[in-house]
């Protein structure tokens, strides 16, 4: 943890908030039809530090981290289970996964959840190549986010590849 904090002091752009993320999470959680949970493939302590630096208090939302499961699918399922208890829901009518990495695309596909990507430039291109149909640049336009959360679709299965490498 000390190393992460030292790197952050040296480069203030590390772990910077994706524009609008903190206010979006709070606002979205006030919507009756949407509830927020945080799932991260990072270890709890480092993920909480990164969220804190980005202005997000992980304790405000149900959450799960790498400490909670060996796979990203299990981490996400654990976050959902915590959210069901936290929000007193037997099950959610719709779950949309939001992510910025290829592992997020794979996890959403494996769990058959609609997916909304977040990224610009090369990151956006990689998400789209991996199958993301909707990718936003950041969380600064709330109405845009709501539209894409509503429109997000379950990702198609990856095409089967032969065992040959080219």
Description of each model-found segment:
Residues 6-38, 44, 48:
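Short, acidic loop-to-helix structural element flanking the phosphoryl-transfer center
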Residues 159, 165:
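Cationic, low-complexity basic patches in intrinsically disordered or flexible, solvent-exposed regions
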Residues 97-134:
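Acidic, Mg2+-coordinating phosphoryl-transfer loop and its flanking beta/alpha structural elements
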Residues 64, 134-141:
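Short acidic-hydrophobic, aromatic-tinged amphipathic segments that line or gate anion-handling sites
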Residues 37, 42-96, 102-111:
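Substrate-recognition "cap/lid" segment bordering the active-site pocket of phosphatases
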Residues 16-20, 42-43, 67, 100, ...:
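Short beta->alpha linker loops
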Residues 1-4:
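Membrane-embedded alpha-helical bundles of multi-pass transporters/translocases
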Residues 142-155:
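Short amphipathic alpha-helix with an adjacent loop that forms part of the alpha/beta core around
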């Amino acid at each position: 943890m000390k190393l992460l904090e030292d790197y952050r002091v040296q480069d203030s752009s590390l772990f910077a908030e994706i524009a609008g993320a903190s206010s979006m999470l709070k606002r979205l959680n006030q919507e009756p039809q949407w509830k927020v949970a945080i799932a991260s493939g990072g270890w709890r302590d480092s993920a909480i530090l990164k969220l804190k630096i980005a202005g997000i208090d992980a304790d405000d939302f149900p959450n799960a981290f790498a400490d909670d499961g060996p796979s990203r699918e299990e981490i996400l399922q654990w976050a959902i289970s915590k959210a069901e208890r936290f929000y007193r829901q037997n099950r959610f009518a719709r779950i949309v996964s939001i992510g910025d990495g290829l592992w997020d695309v794979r996890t959403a596909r494996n769990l058959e959840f609609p997916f909304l990507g977040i990224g610009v430039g090369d990151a956006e291109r990689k998400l789209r190549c991996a199958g993301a149909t909707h990718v936003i640049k950041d969380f600064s336009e709330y109405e845009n986010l709501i539209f894409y959360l509503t429109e997000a679709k379950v990702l198609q299965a990856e095409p089967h590849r032969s065992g040959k490498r080219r």
